């Protein structure tokens, strides 16, 4: 009869045991929230440009000729701070989003690791999928809906939202809570696939780098490079879902019956290239985003391990 499987503790194994250190979900929530807040302050301008290009539909005709033109027009009309319009709505969402993502990932992965505390790539993908779905439902969908509506409103000739909280009140007053959950299906698909790809790549690269020693220290530079690779993979893997999600959450979402109809209309009216509109600015943002988040997350966890002992 096989011996019972050794229990998995949430503390570091004794030196020389070869068992991987596990991260307490509470630490993951704190570290993830901090990493998410810092990252969004650095990368928001590229997110703003990406959203503008995706909302700049061909049928209008287009307002911008490209990334550079979008930046020039924004700075000319609103100054450099114009590239940060809508930051508050994304910042309020980014902190809890990263907290939920990493907290859920560590919670799931701590129950899916082998007796040595290692997480293989396949299980890393599943844990990433679970983390992505959790952040989509709890945080991303309502916050992204408000963000897209706010940015879209500010570019109209008669903006009606005076700020983030005023925008939220108006959206809820006019459309109810349902108004903050537009594009939920697309968001769940997008975030789920996003984090599944990122954590799959990150887990694979970590396992390759650490080899037979799961506790081999990760240099922040190496973590950043791995994070950038994971981010790039997620961009090429799910940009079409990101485009559909943005359309479903914009002020003209009423044009589409559902997520599938949105995709069909984009393909029919604008062609397949429309699904990759905004890819270049998104690629730059996401690679930097994921690299920053993983580096800060890992470093904060290391610090927390010194001051917060978990059993």
Curated annotation (Swiss-Prot):
Ranges occupied by Solcar repeats: 23-111, 122-208, 218-303
Primary gene name: Slc25a1
Family indicated by similarity: Belongs to the mitochondrial carrier (TC 2.A.29) family.
Residues bearing the modification Phosphoserine: 156
Membrane topology: Multi-pass membrane protein
Record field: transmembrane: 29-46, 86-105, 129-143, 183-202, 224-241, 278-297
Residues of the signal peptide: none
Functional summary from the UniProt entry: Mitochondrial electroneutral antiporter that exports citrate from the mitochondria into the cytosol in exchange for malate. Also able to mediate the exchange of citrate for isocitrate, phosphoenolpyruvate, cis-aconitate and to a lesser extent trans-aconitate, maleate and succinate. In the cytoplasm, citrate plays important roles in fatty acid and sterol synthesis, regulation of glycolysis, protein acetylation, and other physiopathological processes.
Organismal lineage: Eukaryota, Metazoa, Chordata, Craniata, Vertebrata
Main location: mitochondrion
Name of the protein in its database record: Tricarboxylate transport protein, mitochondrial
Organism (species): Rattus norvegicus
Maturation and modification: Possesses a short cleavable presequence, which, however, is found to be dispensable both for targeting to mitochondria and insertion into the inner membrane. However, the presequence is required to keep SLC25A1 in a soluble state and thus in an import-competent state. Mature SLC25A1 lacking the presequence is prone to aggregation.
GO molecular function annotation: antiporter activity; citrate secondary active transmembrane transporter activity; citrate transmembrane transporter activity; tricarboxylic acid transmembrane transporter activity
An example Gene Ontology biological process: mitochondrial citrate transmembrane transport
Subcellular location: Mitochondrion inner membrane
Keyword hit for Protease: no
Residue numbers covered by the propeptide annotation in the UniProt entry: 1-13
């Amino acid at each position: 009869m096989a011996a019972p499987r050794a229990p998995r503790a949430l503390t570091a194994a004794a030196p020389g045991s070869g068992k991987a250190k596990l991260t307490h979900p509470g630490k993951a929530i704190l570290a993830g929230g901090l990493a998410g807040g810092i990252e969004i302050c650095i990368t928001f301008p590229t997110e703003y440009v990406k959203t503008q290009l995706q909302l700049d539909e061909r049928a209008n005709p287009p307002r911008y000729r490209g990334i550079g033109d979008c930046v020039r027009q924004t700075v000319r009309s609103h100054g450099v701070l114009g590239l940060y319009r809508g930051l508050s709505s994304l910042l309020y969402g980014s902190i809890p989003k990263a907290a939920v993502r990493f907290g859920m990932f560590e919670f799931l992965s701590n129950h899916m690791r082998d007796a040595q505390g290692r997480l293989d790539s396949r299980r890393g993908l599943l844990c990433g999928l679970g983390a992505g779905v959790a952040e989509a439902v709890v945080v991303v969908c309502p916050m992204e809906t408000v963000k897209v509506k706010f940015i879209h409103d500010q570019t109209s000739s008669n903006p009606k939202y005076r700020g983030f909280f005023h925008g939220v009140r108006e959206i809820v007053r006019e459309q109810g809570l349902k108004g903050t959950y537009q594009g939920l299906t697309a968001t769940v698909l997008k975030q789920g696939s996003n984090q599944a790809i990122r954590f799959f790549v990150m887990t694979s690269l970590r396992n390759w780098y650490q080899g037979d020693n799961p506790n081999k220290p990760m240099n922040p530079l190496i973590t950043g490079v791995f994070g950038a690779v994971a981010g790039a993979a997620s961009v090429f893997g799910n940009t079409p879902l990101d485009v559909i999600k943005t359309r479903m959450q914009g002020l003209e979402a009423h044009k589409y019956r559902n997520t599938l109809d949105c995709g069909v209309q984009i393909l029919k009216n604008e062609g397949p290239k429309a699904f990759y509109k905004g890819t270049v600015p998104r690629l730059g943002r996401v690679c930097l985003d994921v690299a920053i988040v993983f580096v800060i997350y890992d470093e904060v966890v290391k610090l927390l391990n010194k001051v917060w002992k978990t059993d």
